[in-house]
Curated annotation (Swiss-Prot):
The protein, known as: Peptide deformylase
Keyword Hydrolase: yes
Free-text function comment from the UniProt entry: Removes the formyl group from the N-terminal Met of newly synthesized proteins. Requires at least a dipeptide for an efficient rate of reaction. N-terminal L-methionine is a prerequisite for activity but the enzyme has broad specificity at other positions.
GO molecular function terms noted in the UniProt entry: metal ion binding; peptide deformylase activity
Pfam family, one: Pep_deformylase
SUPFAM superfamilies on file: Peptide deformylase
Positions that bind Fe cation: 110, 153, 157
CDD domains reported for this sequence: Pep_deformylase
Length: 183
């Protein structure tokens, strides 16, 4: 079971590396990593389990955040219409996105960042992603609103980008310039 002790914190170089694609079909090890990450996110949202194990609540977790430099992440979050997105994804790729941007009015947080970082994080309002789910099935999803923001936050982790790198005008010792390929 993944706990907060397994979460890599900001300042660790693995969070700044571009993660490696995983081999397909998924190995049993990669499938298990996705299942374990998804279990952590679900547990973090259960008040009893979270209190018992000292888990901070989250809606997504990327493999680099547990020290694994692979293109894997898990999400367990509900969109504005009540649709649940609960899955692990391997080799996610954005195949299209809007020019229009969106942000969470209260900013973003991160399980790897143990402090509040004020500021708006501009994200694409809509995007289409492809990848392979934790059961090995090809997926293609059109996302918008809150759930699109969650996916982009996790995708950034796979590219070595922290959410605060996107906050304009932020003076922060951990902030890095965005790479040229950033969405």
């Amino acid at each position: 079971m993944i706990t907060m002790d397994d979460i890599v914190r900001e300042g660790n170089p693995i969070l700044r590396k571009v993660a490696e694609p995983v081999e397909l079909p998924l190995t049993d090890e990669d499938k298990q990593t996705l299942v374990d990450m998804l279990e952590f996110i679900k547990n973090s949202q259960d008040p009893e389990i979270a209190e018992k194990y000292g888990l901070r609540p989250g809606v997504g977790l990327a493999a680099p955040q547990i020290g694994i430099s692979k293109r894997l992440f898990a999400i367990h979050a509900t969109d504005e219409n009540g649709n649940l997105y609960s899955m692990g994804i391997a080799n996610p790729k954005v195949v299209s996105h809007s020019v229009e941007t969106n942000e969470l009015e209260n900013g973003e947080g991160c399980l790897s960042v143990d402090r509040d970082v004020p500021g708006l994080v501009p994200r694409r309002a809509r995007l289409t992603i492809t990848g392979v789910d934790h059961e090995g099935n090809d997926v293609r999803m059109r996302l918008r609103g809150y759930i699109a923001i969650v996916f982009q936050h996790e995708l950034d982790h796979l590219d070595g980008i922290m959410f605060y790198d996107r906050i304009e005008g932020l003076e922060d010792p951990f902030k890095k310039p965005l790479p040229g390929f950033a969405l």
